[in-house]
Every structure is written in structure tokens, then in C-alpha cells.
Design a protein with these regions (language model features):
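Bacterial N-terminal signal peptides
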Residues: 12-23
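Bacterial N-terminal signal peptides that target proteins for export
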Residues: 2-14
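Gly/Ala-rich beta-loop-alpha elbow adjacent to hydrolase catalytic centers
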Residues: 177, 181, 185
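Boundary at the C-terminal end of the N-terminal hydrophobic targeting segment
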Residues: 23-31
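Active-site catalytic motif of lipid deacylating hydrolases and related acyltransferases
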Residues: 41-49, 75-79, 85-172, 335-397
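Surface cap/lid and interfacial helix-loop subdomains adjacent to catalytic sites
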Residues: 150-170, 190-356, 368, 382, ...
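N-terminal module-boundary/linker segments of secreted carbohydrate-active enzymes
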Residues: 30-68
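Active-site-proximal beta-strand/loop segments in catalytic clefts of secreted hydrolases
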Residues: 86-89, 127-131, 178-179, 208-212, ...
Length: 398
């Protein structure tokens, strides 16, 4: 019998959230006990152990001429940088907040979005009582989710404070999140990091696609963050890479979930992950999960005319390009597929969320935010680490 196909580690869970938008508001459930982040068991990823971030991910290169070599992701030895990651909404647990027993969704999402960062930094990823898919459904039906949101952030804050106090050892760090994870990281920056100059100096980069970062139109800072700007040039530190993806010619509609500012005079920040500061089309370095059975505009993806890949991931350098667009309240990363006649690689990619056969226009290509530029994002962090290492090596011995 053929193996059962399944949604991707990130997109599958969020698609379930989309499907659940039509569900009734769930009955409240008693939250799980508060986690103790001094225990390693409260973390999905920690340096130096076997977990979701030490998994060697087999990936095949996919080029216009067809498949290339296969590689395995690696874990860096003694990198000069830490990465602290908060995963997106993936939990299918009952109630408004998840328990502290990570399921397949949390593990596969973390593996897909974050494991490759372990090639350039020490990985830290707390388990937290996140707002569940049921909470997304309840919110969409008009429910008040203030308490579930506060509970989730309280866990992330506790994990963060444990990390800084007992695990970070004064090292520079990069923050990584997506969707709900990006919301949590936003709050960490605004409430903790911006209020501590010494801590802010150690934050070298925040990578938080998939949730709106508001800035005054024409500015780089001043909305969501008071001091931390959007990145405006390659190699810049102490800044934020943020964007929400929309397919070319499909701009966010008024009132969109992502890519549309709901405050007068504001826009949604967009930083091109491949070339911060660029307002032109730039080719992206992507890692795609190839085993998804989710609906895709244009029909199922044929990754290559040579057939399906032998690995669960393919890497494409230039299959898609991204361009930051800001137009009044709208701010988004426009995504274009680059396929010429005779090319052997895919002629389209996915990313939209389908509900009952209809794609949600206000969510854009939310499911592809990380995958479409993961190679670029890892490189952004890696270049900062390399710069730190070279500066350390250049310092005279005392």
C-alpha cells in the first residue's frame, strides 16, 4: 500500500485552523499546569542533545535543469550566536491553550522552520501553552481570547527569562518566530528587550514573518516597536526582518488578517529576507516540504518534470522571487514564481489557506512565509555569527 500523504509540518496545522473557522466556539478547558523552564523537558530544542533541532534533514537541490545533489542539514560546533525560537499556531489540543506535551505538529513544525538554524547558532525552543487551533476558530467567531493569549505569552516570557538568566551566558542572540510565534517575540522585544539597553545590544536580529509589524508610513520604526527598526540594509544588526507574503497581483484586501494596517497613518513593515532594504524583485533561497497534500492554487504541485523528489524537502534557489510593496496601509512581500518554457522545476508553489475549496484572500501565502526564504533567513543569521567570530578573532590577546 502507498504511504498516506499528509499536510506539511507547518501548513497542515494552520490549514486545520482555517477549516476550523466554521466550527463552534469550544468549551473552556482547564489549562495545563505552568511549565518549569529550569527543566530541560520543558524545551523542544536545546544545544547538544538529540531533539527536533538536531535532526539531519535530507534535502534535494532542485534547479531549472532538474534535480541535483542531496544534502543533510548540519549542527554547528560552538557557534558564536544563540537562536531563540517560538513556533506558530499548530496545536490541535482541546481547549484554548495547548498542554505541555508536544505532539507531532509542534515537533515537525519546529524541525521544518527552525532546525536549519542550528547550522549557525545554538538552538533554544521552549514548549509553551500556545493558543490552539480551537482558539483561532473561537477568535474568528468573535470570542474574547485575551486570557488564552496572556497565558501563552506568560509561558514564553518565563522561558525567555530562564534562558537569559541560566542558559544564555551573556551571548549575542537572534530571535525567530512565525505567526503566533512572531506575536510572542514582538511582545518580548517591546516589553523586555527595548527596556534593557544591555539586552538590546545583544539582540543581533529578530526574524518574525507572518504577523504584522506596524510602522508609520515612510518610517522604519515607531509603531509596534519604539526603538527597534526594520532592517534596511544587508548585515545590519539590532533590527527586525518582518513580512507577510502575498502572491503577485493578489494584494491584501482592506481589513486583511495580514499585510494591512488597522491604525490610521500606519503601514505593515516589509523587509526582503534576501536583501534587506531592497524594493525590487530579488530571487529567494527556499526550502519546500514536498509531501503536502493541501490544496494549492493551480492544482497539485509537480516539483519537477523528472518526477517527485526522493527527499521530503527540496531546496530551490530562484524558483520564486520576492518584492516588498508598501502602499498606504498595505505592506507585504509580493511573491512571483520564475518558470520559463522548458524548465524542469515547478511552475507554481503553494502557501494560501483553503476553506471549503476557497482560498482566504486576507491571509495571503501565510503557509509559505518561512519556507520561501528559509535559506536566506539562515544565511542572514549566519553572516552575523561570522562577523562576530571574525571580530573576536581580531581582538588582541591580553
Amino acid at each position: 500500500m502507498p504511504r498516506k500523504r499528509h499536510p506539511g509540518p507547518v501548513s497542515g496545522a494552520i490549514a486545520l485552523a482555517a477549516i476550523s473557522l466554521t466550527a463552534a466556539t469550544p468549551a473552556p478547558a482547564q489549562p495545563a499546569a505552568a511549565p518549569d523552564y529550569s527543566k530541560d523537558s520543558s524545551w523542544l530544542c536545546l544545544p547538544g542533545r538529540s531533539d527536533s533541532c538536531s535532526t539531519a534533514l535530507p534535502t534535494t537541490a532542485l534547479n531549472p535543469t532538474g534535480y541535483g545533489s542531496t544534502e543533510l542539514s548540519t549542527v554547528a560546533k560552538d557557534p558564536p550566536l544563540d537562536c531563540f525560537y517560538v513556533y506558530p499556531t499548530v496545536s490541535s489540543d482541546a481547549g484554548m491553550n495547548s498542554d505541555m506535551s508536544p505532539g507531532r505538529e509542534e515537533k515537525l513544525t519546529t524541525e521544518s522552520q527552525f532546525a536549519r538554524f542550528a547550522s549557525v547558532c545554538r538552538p533554544f525552543a521552549p514548549i509553551y501553552r500556545q493558543m490552539t487551533l480551537a482558539a483561532v476558530a473561537a477568535y474568528s467567531a468573535g470570542a474574547d481570547i485575551t486570557q488564552p493569549a496572556a497565558l501563552a505569552y506568560g509561558d514564553v516570557l518565563a522561558a525567555w527569562r530562564n534562558y537569559i538568566a541560566t542558559r544564555n551566558e551573556g551571548r549575542p542572540f537572534v530571535l525567530v518566530g512565525h505567526s503566533q510565534g512572531s506575536l510572542m517575540v514582538q511582545q518580548l522585544i517591546a516589553r523586555e528587550i527595548e527596556k534593557d539597553p544591555a539586552l538590546a545590544a545583544r539582540m543581533k536580529l529578530a526574524i518574525i514573518p507572518g504577523y504584522n509589524v506596524l510602522v508609520p508610513q515612510g518610517k522604519l520604526v515607531g509603531g509596534t516597536f519604539k526603538k527597534t527598526p526594520l532592517c534596511s540594509r544587508p548585515g545590519q544588526t539590532g533590527c527586525v526582518i518582518a513580512y507577510s507574503s502575498f502572491r503577485e497581483k493578489n494584494e491584501p484586501p482592506a481589513g486583511a488578517m495580514f499585510g494591512y494596517a488597522d491604525q490610521p497613518g500606519m503601514t505593515v513593515g516589509c523587509v526582503n529576507p534576501a536583501l534587506p532594504g531592497s524594493r525590487s524583485w530579488v530571487k529567494l533561497d527556499s526550502y519546500w516540504f514536498t509531501r503536502s497534500s493541501l490544496q494549492v492554487p493551480g492544482g497539485p504541485i509537480q516539483w519537477s518534470t523528472e518526477g517527485q523528489p526522493s527527499t521530503p524537502y527540496v531546496r530551490t534557489e530562484g524558483l520564486v522571487s520576492g518584492k516588498c510593496v508598501n502602499d498606504g496601509p498595505r505592506g507585504y512581500l509580493s511573491i512571483r514564481t520564475n518558470h520559463a518554457p522548458g524548465d524542469k522545476w515547478a511552475d507554481h508553489v503553494g502557501g494560501e489557506i483553503a476553506v471549503l475549496g476557497m482560498f482566504l484572500p486576507g491571509w495571503g501565502m501565510h503557509l509559505a512565509d518561512m519556507a520561501e526564504a528559509e535559506g536566506d533567513l539562515v544565511r542572514d543569521a549566519g553572516e552575523i555569527g561570522a562577523s562576530l567570530r571574525s571580530r573576536t578573532a581580531a581582538q588582541p590577546a591580553h
